[in-house]
Amino acid sequence: MNKVALPPTQPLPDAQAWQGAMSDVGLDWVGMQGIALPLELAGKPLMAKVNAGINLRASRHGARGIHMSRLYLTLDELTQGELTPQRIADSLRAFLASQPEHSDSASLSISGELMLSRPALLSAHRGWKAYPLKIDASLTTGLTLSLTVGVPYSSTCPSSAALSRQLAQQQFQFDFEQAPDKVSQQQVIDWLGEQGMPGTPHSQRSWAWVTVTLNEGEAELPVVNLIDRIEHALGTPLQTLVKRQDEQAFALANGQNLMFCEDAARRLYRMLRSQCHHRAFSLRVEHQESLHAHNAVAELSWQEAGNAA
């Protein structure tokens, strides 16, 4: 390859600083998407993808573009310890400080999957489960910070359960119609164990997506606490390692927590209002149907009076 002679003292051209033909047209957001960063959240590693950007103000003498490398360099601060609201806010302020002549608004989006070790329902085993999450932060006159988590769970259809119980009743009547008054307890027990479920209710893997707007001054991102509360409210979180005793306990949990998507959404609403005390929240539940070729979905949102989040 031919060598190129570069004058050692000549400054490098900065094309971004040149005034473009339409530099009087501002841009709402300019930045980078899909930046890979190794972060730490809740004391655990998080292989994250980050979107980072700022606005570009309109000006007759404005710049053609922003210096994205300055934003990239400031992101390294996020990797230096536990991811906290303060660390995120500091990064956003550094975005604005890196090019104050062009911008007065900065934003950051962090997404990934947090791995948590979860115990089995009864046996002395544990397994790992991945929880998708997203953190959205913006800084203009103040900091706005929201946390979204996805929690998988099982849902058994109440209507299908009722239809299945009716089938069991009908089958029992048919099998013992010859001598209904002479059926012993042991016969009933044997029948239930061998033929007591002529039909089974349908259930499906389901997802709860919950977004909360954090209060000012929160020291930590309450991701594990939020996941735990969602799972407790629903009662049927998906399992990891399962032995037969755990599977039976899971069947019992599903039977005791029959849910339409509307029921699941209302359970989460009551939990978030009574236990979490965030400025605002929204939620979406998806029952990925095993009966239908479509999903059953319910959505709900709330914000405290006077909050514009």
From Swiss-Prot:
Keywords in alphabetical order: Hydrolase
GO biological process: tetrahydrofolate biosynthetic process
Keyword Nucleotidyltransferase: no
Pfam families in the record: GCHY-1
Site description May be catalytically important, residues in chain: 157
Pathway field: Cofactor biosynthesis; 7,8-dihydroneopterin triphosphate biosynthesis; 7,8-dihydroneopterin triphosphate from GTP: step 1/1
Family to which this protein belongs: Belongs to the GTP cyclohydrolase IV family.
Protein name: GTP cyclohydrolase FolE2
Native organism: Serratia proteamaculans (strain 568)
Classification of source organism: Bacteria, Pseudomonadati, Pseudomonadota, Gammaproteobacteria, Enterobacterales
